[in-house]
Amino acid sequence: MATATENGHAPVPDENTAPDAAPAEQKEQTEQTEQKEEKTQTNGDIVTVFHDPDNFNVKHPLMHEWTLWFTKPPSGKGDNWNELLKEVVTFGSVEEFWGIYNNITPTSELGLKADYHLFKKGIRPEWEDQQNKHGGKWSYSFKDKRSVAIDDLWLHAQLAAIGETLENDGDNEVMGVVVNVRKGFYRIGLWTRTVGKSIPGDKNGTEGRSAAKGKEILENIGRRFKEVLRLKETDVVEFSGHTDSAHSGSTRAKAKYTV
């Protein structure tokens, strides 16, 4: 494994290396140190780590566990995409997320055709995954790579995903987010479980939804995604189904919805 660079970031992965996540313990120690600031009790007294050490070692769990994946740049035309896709690490708390994020290569330093994928645990970032095959994705391409703050935008996309702010409770659509590094652009995508189709209720009392409601849910997610990416009102974010993309032979198919 290569050594860290002078600016403190992990090295840019070469063709045969996926980015390593530093041990979570290192970040936890940093977080615990930062949290040794004074806090006020309801009675006005000051609480420090000396008064209540347990509260300064607490992890803040996320609603779901998430897995970070990395697609390393291909070395030749014969490379199998599945072999390029590497699982990096799974985490379930805010502290673990920051420990990972602060110790891997920034998106802006990745090689061409590299990708980061952040998906709920148990879901592979592939169209063929059982939980993805009926879904689709919102995506936007940033074509001026020199002027876009891709590291900040990717961070905000990840925080919105793990913070569960991209959809309403019960929508159950967001599967994960992805960033692609390409020669002429960066692209950030948000994968969903469905393409907005109707879902019947079941005998267990689970409420179904109409196709119109499904479309409304996806468009609401698209609008929130657009806000997270700090896009202008005139910018257009497109949604396409994975099946349509597969049939077109491209990661981009004709847009099913736009916001």
Question: Which residues fall in each region the model found?
Answer:
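Intrinsically disordered, low-complexity regions enriched in proline, serine, glycine
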Residues: 78-80, 99-101, 109-113, 200-201
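Short charge-dense sequence patches
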Residues: 44-54, 100-111, 151-159
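Glycine-rich loop/turn
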Residues: 62-88
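Conserved NAD+-utilizing ADP-ribose enzyme module
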Residues: 108, 115-259
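Intrinsic disorder/low-complexity signal
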Residues: 1-61, 250-259
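Extended catalytic/binding region for NAD+/ADP-ribose chemistry, centered on the ART fold
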Residues: 82-104, 140
